[in-house]
């Protein structure tokens, strides 16, 4: 299939993590699946996925813990012959306040273990990212406590706003809008 893309959301497995900030990538993928009226239909030991042939995209969530996400991303790229520059990784970003969505074409992991794993397994920093802000004024300064905390009822409106922005950006990406154009619109 010509120019297939991969959109993968990062998160942790298990009901105990489902509503945590660290699972923002999974939340975005779930919302994207809902937009296209599909579910992740296939699974292996590394992840769950669906190939949307009409849109030339694979939507996916790893079945690994965050720190091992790169194993699935590497497998998916090899399985569908997807180049790293056609990969979009969606993940939580503690450096940005909740409600913020930023796109990036390459760069370091900035202490995000899921991104560190993707970089290590793809052997490159040259892949696209959608960074979903999760920082809250009410959260601890201890990294683990912050990312494993749940969104509060007071944060629900900001969460919904950010999910809407993320879906708009990913829909553009899937529809073939260039990353530079998407960054111009969504990073403004």
From Swiss-Prot:
Q: Where in the cell is it found?
A: Cytoplasm
Q: Which PANTHER family match?
A: PEPTIDYL-TRNA HYDROLASE
Q: Which residues form a coiled coil?
A: none
Lineage from the top down?
A: Bacteria, Bacillati, Mycoplasmatota, Mycoplasmoidales, Mycoplasmoidaceae
EC number(s): the record gives 3.1.1.29
- Describe its function: Hydrolyzes ribosome-free peptidyl-tRNAs (with 1 or more amino acids incorporated), which drop off the ribosome during protein synthesis, or as a result of ribosome stalling.
- In the UniProt record, does the keyword Hydrolase occur? yes
Question: What's the protein here called?
Answer: Peptidyl-tRNA hydrolase
- Please name the NCBIfam families in this protein's record: pth (TIGR00447)
A GO CC annotation given for this chain: cytoplasm
Residue numbers marked as site, Stabilizes the basic form of H active site to accept a proton: 92
Q: How does it assemble?
A: Monomer.
Q: Which reaction does it catalyse?
A: an N-acyl-L-alpha-aminoacyl-tRNA + H2O = an N-acyl-L-amino acid + a tRNA + H(+)
Q: Where is this site: Discriminates between blocked and unblocked aminoacyl-tRNA?
A: 12
Q: Which HAMAP family match?
A: Pept_tRNA_hydro_bact
Catalytic class of the enzyme = hydrolase
- Which GO biological process categories is it annotated with? protein quality control for misfolded or incompletely synthesized proteins; rescue of stalled ribosome
The record's similarity note reads:
Belongs to the PTH family.
Checking Pfam families in the record gives: Pept_tRNA_hydro
Spell out the molecular function terms from Gene Ontology.
peptidyl-tRNA hydrolase activity; tRNA binding
Q: Which UniProt keywords apply?
A: Cytoplasm, Hydrolase, RNA-binding, tRNA-binding
Name the residues annotated as catalytic in the UniProt entry: 22 (proton acceptor)
């Amino acid at each position: 299939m010509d120019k297939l893309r991969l959109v993968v959301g990062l998160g942790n497995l298990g009901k105990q993590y489902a509503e945590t900030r660290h699972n923002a990538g999974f939340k975005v993928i779930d919302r994207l699946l809902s937009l296209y009226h599909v579910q992740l239909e296939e699974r292996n030991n590394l992840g769950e996925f669906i190939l949307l042939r009409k849109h030339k995209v694979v939507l996916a969530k790893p079945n690994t813990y965050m720190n091992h996400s790169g194993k699935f991303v590497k497998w998916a790229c090899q399985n569908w012959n997807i180049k790293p520059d056609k990969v979009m990784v969606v993940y939580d970003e503690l450096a940005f306040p909740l409600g913020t969505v930023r796109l990036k074409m390459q760069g370091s992991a900035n202490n995000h273990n899921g991104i560190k794993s993707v970089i290590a397994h793809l052997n490159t920093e040259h892949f696209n990212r959608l960074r979903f802000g999760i920082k809250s004024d009410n959260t601890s300064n201890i990294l683990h406590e912050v990312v494993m905390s749940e969104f509060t009822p007071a944060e629900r409106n900001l969460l919904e706003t950010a999910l809407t922005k993320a879906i708009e950006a990913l829909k553009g990406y899937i529809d073939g809008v260039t990353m530079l154009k998407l960054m111009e619109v969504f990073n403004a």
